[in-house]
Design a protein with these regions (language model features):
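Mature catalytic core of soluble alpha/beta enzymes
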Residues: 2-284
Length: 284
């Protein structure tokens, strides 16, 4: 499972410059990391900022394992089935996703890796928060006719509205390993150990992952799924990871049908790149 990691995603237009662009940006600390929102029109910033802050605040209250009154803490002593049955409607999909990924990965990803009496959803909480924020902004945007917006939480991104170009930073720190576009509703997440060694743990052993993987980047139709997949695919590595993705293809509980639209980029310590990218999303 995953601890807080350094940020590796930077919007490409912030690096390349924004000549003639009216992009507005706002950032603030939340959920143990940094959140930021970007809007292409100045007048849209209050709407995207309000929707995002409300969603992130809600998730912080619901899934804080250090808060004895949070839903996560209240449910942690129940069985996995009872957790799903008793979870609030707003977060049930969060638990279902965690337990499904745990089952398909053979326990490599496990929200109970700290012990049977502890639920830890840190590996997907950021993605869940991003999905809520994007849905909230899109709903408000329809009534207010608001424009394009991109939401970032700790380096995980979701296009709340419109299309955005971004890139995953090279481990050598000299530019981008790849660039790609995010279309409306799509998200990208990365799990990495570039600077401080691995802070991602294999729940099967309880040890930090040491499998030659430097980072995994996942583009998916949900930020929560991108978050979960980037973590489990880092743990599993390319060979086991591809086997996991084949299982996901056949899994009826996967909410988006076949997983053909999931794009994955592994960057290895050897310098090699391994991809699962049927639609050619990553550009090198």
């Amino acid at each position: 499972m995953r601890e807080i990691l350094p940020l590796f995603f930077l919007p490409l237009f912030l690096i390349a410059g924004c000549s003639g662009s009216s992009i507005e940006k706002s950032s603030w600390p939340v959920m143990g990391t940094i959140a930021s929102v970007q809007a292409r029109e100045k007048g849209d910033m209050p709407h995207v900022e309000a929707a995002t802050k409300e969603a992130f605040s809600l998730v912080e209250k619901l899934l804080n394992r250090f808060d004895s009154t949070s839903e996560l803490t209240v449910l942690q002593n129940l069985s996995d089935d009872d957790v799903v049955k008793n979870a609030s409607v707003s977060v049930r999909s969060c638990y279902e996703t965690a337990f499904l990924v745990s089952r398909l990965s053979g326990g490599a990803f496990n929200p109970r890796w700290r012990g049977r009496q502890t639920l830890d959803l840190g590996a997907i909480a950021k993605g869940f928060a991003l999905d809520l924020a994007a849905a909230s902004y899109l709903q408000a945007a329809e009534s207010k006719k608001s424009g394009d917006a991109l939401i970032d939480l700790g380096g995980n991104l979701i296009s709340a509205k419109g299309s955005w170009t971004t890139g995953v930073k090279s481990p050598e720190g000299n530019g981008f390993a790849s660039v790609f576009s995010l279309f409306q509703g799509e998200a990208v997440a990365t799990s990495a150990s570039y600077y401080r060694g691995s802070h991602i743990y294999d729940a099967r052993t309880g040890n930090a992952v040491s499998n030659g993987v430097l980072s995994v980047t996942v583009i998916a139709r949900s930020a929560m799924w991108a978050d979960a997949l980037s973590t489990v695919l880092f743990i599993l590595g390319p060979r086991e990871g591809m086997e996991f993705l084949e299982k996901l293809q056949r899994e009826p509980a996967y909410p988006f049908g076949r997983a053909d639209d999931v794009a994955v980029l592994w960057i290895m310590e050897s310098g090699s790149r391994v991809t699962v990218d049927k639609k050619g999303r990553f550009r090198f």
